[in-house]
Amino acid sequence: MRHLLLLFLCPCAIGVAFHLWLFNFSGLFTWFPVWSQRSYDIVVGVLSARHNHELRNVIRHTWLQHLKQHSSLSQRILVKFIIGSHGCDIPVEDREDPYSCKLLNITNPTFKQEIESFSIPDIAALLTEHHVVNVNFRVLYPVVITRLGVFQHDSAAGFHRNITVKLFQTEHEEALFSARFSPASSGVQVNGIWYKPVEQFILPEGFEGTVVWESHDPEGLLSGNVHRVIVNDGGGIFRITTVKEGLLPYEFTEGVEGIAGGFTYTIHEGEALLNTLETRPERIQIHLAALEKEDALLQEESTTFQDIVFVHVVDTYRNVPSKLLNFYQWTAEFTSFEFLLKTDDDCFIDIENVLEKIAHKQLQKENTWWGNFRLNWAVDRTGKWQELEYLSPAYPAFACGSGYVISQDIVQWLASNSQRLKTYQGEDVSMGIWMSAIGPSRYQDSHWLCEKKCEAGMLSSPQYTPQELLELWQQKERCGNPCACEDR
């Protein structure tokens, strides 16, 4: 009897264990049983931010509803929204930038006085052969630069060098301001650094700058290694960025990395910063409560519509490439399909037109990438699309993110190599870099629009509000043209 009981219980235990394994696979919350797989013509992956409920609902009530109402289409197409399973637990006001989830870690800032950016122990400063030295920095809270300075040995009486100091906005060829030091015009010496005043500018949060020291004498500069200099960052107001941290030299950078002087600065609107820091604990508590509510709403939304794949990443802009790779893993593991269409939740998609064109173009089911490709797109070294870890000045060809189609074998390759593929600043350029390794057949089609505009016959168009998406669909339903209907 005991053996008979085990015979019945073991399959159940194995089934439960298998269910739990599926539930936890790669951190994906959506369970898609292997034994109920259906073969689809297209899997549509819609990248969506956690808070974009309205955009998802508009899609559900427009073209996605249209698919479900047509049995032939619903059997051929599977649509899933791709959402990060975790929200950033830091309020936007307390992050280094709105694109990542890094705490703006400012502590004990110095207000209402000039701060010397660098000081250097005697043993750390050496007369070098380098005539041009530079250092890069990033502003994390607005500052005002007041003076530029240059090192000189304490033992020297007076200033006997000819040196120019310039401060650039990174990747710009023209200096914002500069100071020229000479025996006849040496400025004022403070703590071993000679300073001269400069025109005062507010350097905003996120500003990326480069200070360049240039010697006009036969001998080189007195300079120190950036890792041996004392950085007076005002409690975290700015940060030195170095090549040794894995970042590339900027295109217009002159000379070698080092510090041959400094600058003085004041914190702009210190009272506002103090208020931000004092109210941070309360703000974080409110934010965490809102995250819990958002989690509950997303789980309810997922249960109701059964169209969300939660991927195990913190849902921020910088993590979008990882979101996509995680979705490719899920798709390769739990679905059977011929093509995958990737789009965003703010895009208009004409899915029937996509199907018709696949048939008309007779797209191959292997090694195929169909989209609107950007060629020789310059790599940005600053700003939202900053990329410091891709060596070339231009990206490989990549399809606009509003919509593109890839064949099943490419998805399988991406999924199989997802743990080794490096992610870059955007999912579209990351895809171009990844695909350069395997060289798929690219099918160029300008009907995948890269910018927000409406054209007859378009396959996709990006950057719409929920109301605009609804209006486009209503016009398509009314007269077949989402852009305009002629009144009769």
Curated annotation (Swiss-Prot):
Membrane-spanning residues: 3-23
Subcellular location(s) of the protein: Golgi apparatus membrane; Endoplasmic reticulum
Cytoplasmic compartment segments: 1-2
Gene Ontology cellular-component annotations: endoplasmic reticulum; Golgi membrane
Signal peptide: none
Pfam families named in the record: Galactosyl_T
Membrane topology per record: Single-pass type II membrane protein
Pathway given in the UniProt record: Protein modification; protein glycosylation
EC number(s) given by UniProt: 2.4.1.313
Biological processes annotated in GO: protein glycosylation; protein O-linked glycosylation
An annotated Gene Ontology molecular function: acetylgalactosaminyltransferase activity
Superkingdom, taxonomy of origin: Eukaryota
Glycosylation sites: 24, 105, 162
UniProt family annotation: Belongs to the glycosyltransferase 31 family.
Protein name, per record: UDP-GalNAc:beta-1,3-N-acetylgalactosaminyltransferase 2
Native source organism of the sequence: Xenopus tropicalis
Origin organism lineage: Eukaryota, Metazoa, Chordata, Craniata, Vertebrata
